[in-house]
Amino acid sequence: MNIMDFNVKKLAADAGTFLSRAVQFTEEKLGQAEKTELDAHLENLLSKAECTKIWTEKIMKQTEVLLQPNPNARIEEFVYEKLDRKAPSRINNPELLGQYMIDAGTEFGPGTAYGNALIKCGETQKRIGTADRELIQTSALNFLTPLRNFIEGDYKTIAKERKLLQNKRLDLDAAKTRLKKAKAAETKSSSEQELRITQSEFDRQAEITRLLLEGISSTHAHHLRCLNDFVEAQMTYYAQCYQYMLDLQKQLGSFPSNYLSNNNQTSGTPVPYALSNAIGPSAQASTGSLVITCPSNLNDLKESSNNRKARVLYDYDAANSTELSLLADEVITVFSVVGMDSDWLMGERGNQKGKVPITYLELLN
Amino acid sequence: MDFNMKKLASDAGIFFTRAVQFTEEKFGQAEKTELDAHFENLLARADSTKNWTERILRQTEVLLQPNPSARVEEFLYEKLDRKVPSRVTNGELLAQYMAEAASELGPSTPYGKTLIKVSEAEKRLGAAERDFIHTASLSFLTPLRNFLEGDWKTISKERRLLQNRRLDLDACKARLKKAKAAEAKATTVPDFQETRPRNYILSASASALWNDEVDKAEQELRVAQTEFDRQAEVTRLLLEGISSTHVNHLRCLHEFVKSQTTYYAQCYRHMLDLQKQLGSSQGAIFPGTFVGTTEPASPPLSSTSPTTTAATMPVVPTGAVLAPPEEAALCLEEVAPPASGTRKARVLYDYEAADSSELALLADELITVYSLPGMDPDWLIGERGNKKGKVPVTYLELLS
């Protein structure tokens, strides 16, 4: 019986409180009741927290899309995460492409020019795939996880305290209203007492909320650090991939000898005259493409500002005293000069020095 | 009407003959003309080229556009012969969000300022990615697709014709064999029937009849053989064209490698620029934050400086790990401003020179540093006034 009474009493009290809040809220909306305004500073903090939450969420989602553009894979990872199971390590796109290229090269014949190039390219794609995987893991660990922790941890706490603050304020305003309406001295005294209690609770809750909101500044500092980590991970990724591509281009740069070998192999088979003509132009175009590939390496040369050895491909007569005459097959030292036409380098042979055209050279390491 | 009917009947007859020949081959009841070994090799090579080209094409498409929905969309646009609308890349979208976040959170705060810088870099990365996708599609995917939809279709068609010619040829051979067998059988009959005049006449007629049949079959065989040989020659020429296809695809592969190198070079440069900006704003970050933030926030922020410093330093070890000494120097030079080749560096800790080739250092001083080709990647040449010597990279904070 006592238990029954206790429960009923508590239930009635809660219902009363709820009703009071509802009445207060309604009267506020209808403009029939006064509302305690939060101070400007607290309002600013609330606005800032809201803003931080929204944009953190957007940035996090878009970074996830950036790292894993395939929505099916993202859904799969999400499901695994919810099931608290470890996601199986998946071969990523560059690794799969690399595998196909290597297999294709093996089948076409590693001794052929195309097969050889495919195998080298495939190996590089695999390395890029590994770097890609590392970027995803590092970014997820250092950037995405902290952002997610903020949204699911700190911000949830802030939201909860904020709700409590709202309730305290409604209680406070309800008490104020009740005091205003009180007539009898005894009722007035009771209302004043109640007002002091609700005011005290409100102030305490406001203080707690303010402290939490001011923590947003340290959240920004933390996210700033995470952003730097993300930048670092991306930096590492692109530096590695760039290095891989440079290595690959150097390997492919030895193409002429491979092509010659392939040509010999092809000529071993009886080839009709018309077909020989068909291969000829392609070969020339291929050679032209190789020459075009050199400027990319030359850009590295310009940036490095280092001396390099170069072999001359064709004879060249200097057009004026600023140029250096060249003989086919000789080796000279070349370097770039800032502000000079990108089609030229400075060449040195012994104590002779002058401009040399890039297209006449084959850069050596 | 007669013409069409005759042609239809003729085609039906041919089809039926081929079907019979094919079936008998499968049951092992008929001989089959074998193609020569060289020809078989060419066929296998063509099949192999087609299969792998298709796989590489598909996987490169996946590499360039990992989102299957976007690929389906592009496919539809292509089929409808309409221009694909230019889509904002994921990097560009992230950049946009970061820029807007910075505006809302306060462009003058440390976090906001960094977000703006990072968003600009991400936008450039996104643009570089778009260029890469476009260039790779144009110079690598399109030629592969043209081969599959052009050359390969032609080869397939000629192969099918060759198959039909071979079936016709083998059908003629089978028919000739039967005719000869019948003729032989007919010529042996008179031995038993000579004594009867009527049978003799019939026997002679049969023999003559089969003889005509044999002649006709031989004629048809010659025609079929000629057509088969001609078709085989045409097909062989097409198959040998695979060599020039390989050369063409090799050139396209080079173009792909080139565009990918350009892409990563651009991205790498953008990241270098970004790190320089973030590094240079490091000094600005601390005072601004200190003024604007309450006391409890200071401790977490103070750890930002070491992180930023660490973010700058790993560039060097990365280069060292990846490349031989010569290339390590080259990679290190990537970090240096191209104009001068030398950089300013601040010393982090005191360092005593171990020998005359090294330079002693004092914490917080500024020196000029540069790298030499072939030198250990953990060292640089440092200069202070007229003093010069080797200095360890780990003791320095490189400035831009």
Swiss-Prot record, chain A:
PTM entry text: Phosphorylated at Thr-145 by CDK5; this phosphorylation is required for autophagy induction in starved neurons and facilitates homodimerization.
Lineage top rank: taxon: Eukaryota
Tissue: Isoform 1 is widely expressed. Isoform 2 is brain-specific. Isoform 3 is predominantly expressed in testis, but it is also detected in liver and, at much lower levels, in skin, stomach and ovary.
Pfam families, A to Z: BAR, SH3_9
Coiled coil segments of this chain: 155-186
Gene Ontology BP terms: 'de novo' post-translational protein folding; apoptotic process; autophagic cell death; cellular response to amino acid starvation; cellular response to glucose starvation; membrane fission; mitochondrion organization; negative regulation of intrinsic apoptotic signaling pathway by p53 class mediator
Keyword Mitochondrion carried by entry: yes
Segments forming domain SH3: 305-365
Additional free-text comment from the UniProt record: Fibroblasts with a reduced level of Sh3glb1 show a defect in retrograde transport between the Golgi apparatus and the endoplasmic reticulum.
General function of this protein: May be required for normal outer mitochondrial membrane dynamics. Required for coatomer-mediated retrograde transport in certain cells. May recruit other proteins to membranes with high curvature. May promote membrane fusion. Involved in activation of caspase-dependent apoptosis by promoting BAX/BAK1 activation. Isoform 1 acts proapoptotic in fibroblasts. Involved in caspase-independent apoptosis during nutrition starvation and involved in the regulation of autophagy. Activates lipid kinase activity of PIK3C3 during autophagy probably by associating with the PI3K complex II (PI3KC3-C2).
UniProt subunit comment: Homodimer, and heterodimer with SH3GLB2. Binds BAX; induction of apoptosis augments BAX binding. Binds DNM1, HTT, AMPH, BIN1 and ARFGAP1. Interacts with UVRAG; UVRAG bridges the interaction to BECN1 indicative for an association with the PI3K complex II (PI3KC3-C2). Isoform 3 interacts with PPP1CC; this interaction leads to the inhibition of phosphatase activity.
Family: Belongs to the endophilin family.
Protein name, UniProt field: Endophilin-B1
Taxonomic lineage: Eukaryota, Metazoa, Chordata, Craniata, Vertebrata
Name of the encoding gene: Sh3glb1
Swiss-Prot record, chain B:
Subcellular location field: Cytoplasm
Protein's UniProt name: Endophilin-B2
Phosphoserine PTM sites in chain numbering: 10, 400
Gene name of this polypeptide: Sh3glb2
Modification N-acetylmethionine, positions: 1
Disulfide topology: none
Domain BAR: 24-287
UniProt xrefs under InterPro entries: AH/BAR_dom_sf (IPR027267), BAR_dom (IPR004148), Endophilin_B2_SH3 (IPR035640), Endophilin_SH3RF (IPR050384), SH3-like_dom_sf (IPR036028), SH3_domain (IPR001452)
Main localization, broad class: cytoplasm
UniProt-listed SUPFAM superfamilies: BAR/IMD domain-like, SH3-domain
GO CC term, one of those recorded: cytoplasm
